Structures are given as structure tokens and as C-alpha cells.
Amino acid sequence: MNAPHTATLAAETITTLVKKRWGGDFVLLAAMWGSSFLLMHISTVEFGPLPTAAMRVGIAAVFLFPLVWLNGLFPDLKKHWRKTFVVGILNSGIPFVCIGFALLSISTGFSAILNATVPMFGALIAWLWLKDKPSASRLLGLLVGFIGVAMLAWRAAGPGATLKASASGAAPIWALLACLLACLCYAMAASYTKRYLSGIPPLVTAAGSQMGAMLGLALPAAVLWPTRMPSGTAWLAVIGVGVLCSGLAYIVFFRLIENAGPARALSVTFLVPVFALFYGAVYLGEAVTPWMLICAAVIVCGTALSTGLLKIWR
């Protein structure tokens, strides 16, 4: 299978996915979250991990709150604030800080690859907590997706790789563990949302979670605020990640959980590395090799199986 063929297969699979009732949200969310690694890297270098995370959720909260008010959803937000606070800590507060710390040592592409372990955590938690037992085809999809991610990770960390985890080519263990902790928190938040916030408007969950995370991070971020004023580029990056990757993206994410379930919603992270690698090539000059395209096709096939788009066994 040559690179052009795999690229065509990936494009066709994504196009088919978009035609699903929730497929458009699935691909859109992957594209938005794929850009978050690039934007967080730019902002974290100057703001620091914790202030960047606080700014991200704070900007998202400021963006979302007027929408809640204009849509007459403030009573719902007030009623469910405790539950959305928990979601905010699990789905934004802890993960954003962990990823910010990791991005100081590993590349954006490598961190996005690690982020693709979320569906594995999500399927396990949904199975144990929500009794959402995956079918054989969906289990195969998780395995195929994991293989695609492993292929990318092997090439990224191996000798002569274009995506180095650090200047020495070795990813610090704490950075890897931080990313995995973030993935575990994402998975827990998705199942918590499905169990306790089903039927709640996605805008309410998105706004409440970002406000909760903002409250949790505000004080430590103020203590660790940089003494030197960050550049305009860093400010634009943190505003972009707040509005696009948190404000708008979480509306799409919670709507996807409602329509497709937490396990399928979390499978979006199989596509995130594909977009992250694309953005890295365009904006950071990282090479996109035929091997990356082959891995992308494997990941997309895994996504199609794990979300039920393709079914091998009933």
C-alpha cells in the first residue's frame, strides 16, 4: 500500500464519517483539538504551564458565559454547577496543567500521539462504570487504533526520527506520565458526564466546566504568573486555544458524548495526532513522511471500527 493510496483511504473514511449524524462533530473536534498542542506549546514557553492552563479555561469561560445567558440557560447552570465543577477539574484543570508541563520537554506531535491513549482508558472506564460493554468490532478498532499510534510513536522516538521528544531524543518519564494522567482524567470526565449530565444542554456543561476549572486554577496561576510580559504571539496563542480549543470545542465534545456516547466521543483522539502532525508540518516545518501517512490511515481505520462506522462482527 503506497502513501498516496493510504492518504486517499484516510480522506474517504473521514468523508464517510462526516455523513454520520454525529460524524461532522467528530472530525471538527479532532481538527480543533489537534491545533491545541501547537497553540499550548507556543503559550506555555512564555506563560508557564499553570498560567497557560488557567488562561485557557478563563478565556473559554468568558467566551461561553454570555452564550449561556443569551440562550436562557443560566438556571440550568446554577442547578448543575457542582457536577460541572467536577467535570471542569477532570476534563480541563488537571489535564491542561499536565500537558503544559509535558510540552516543556516533549514535542507537540509526540504529546498528541500519547493523547491517543484516551480511548483505551475511556473504553475500560465506560465498561466498568457505565456497563457499556464494547462489541468485538469496537474492541478490534481500539486495537487497530493503538497499533497505529504505536507505529507513530516508534518512528517518532526511534533513531533518525523527525519528531524528537527532546533535544537528546529521549522523552523524560515524568512528561510521559503527565500525559497519561491527563488521558486518564479525560476518560473519567467523559463517563462522569454521560452518567450525571445526560440531557443537560452541551453549552451548560461546557460553560460550567470551564468556570469550575478557572476557579480551581486561578490562585496558583496568579502566584506563578510570569514576571516578564509574554509576547504578542504568546497572547494570540493562548486566546486561540481558549476560544477555539476549549470554548467552541467543548460545546462540540459534550454534544458528541450526548449523541454518540463517551466511548465513541473519546475515540476522536485517534484522529487528533493526524491533525497535530499536519499543523506541525505547516507551521513548524516538520516533515510529513510516507510512514506518517500510512500510520494515519491505520489510525483512521481504527477510528472507523471503534466508533461503529465499520463493523466486522455483530
What do the predicted segments below correspond to?
Residues 2-54, 101, 160-195, 314:
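Glycine-/small-residue-enriched transmembrane alpha-helix faces in small-molecule transporters
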Residues 31-40, 65-115, 151, 242-260:
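Specific transmembrane alpha-helical segments of multi-pass solute transporters/efflux pumps
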Residues 64, 122-124, 128, 159-224, ...:
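Transmembrane alpha-helical segments that form core, pore/gating elements
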Residues 64, 125, 134-159, 163, ...:
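Hydrophobic transmembrane alpha-helices of multi-pass small-molecule transport proteins
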Residues 2-9, 21, 46-94, 121, ...:
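Transmembrane alpha-helices of multi-pass small-molecule transport proteins
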Residues 18-22, 46-50, 54, 76-82, ...:
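Juxtamembrane helix-entry segments on the extracytoplasmic side of multipass membrane proteins
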Residues 43, 52, 56, 102, ...:
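Hydrophobic/aromatic residues within transmembrane alpha-helices
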Residues 53-55, 92, 96, 109-117, ...:
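Helix-helix packing/entry segments at the starts of transmembrane helices
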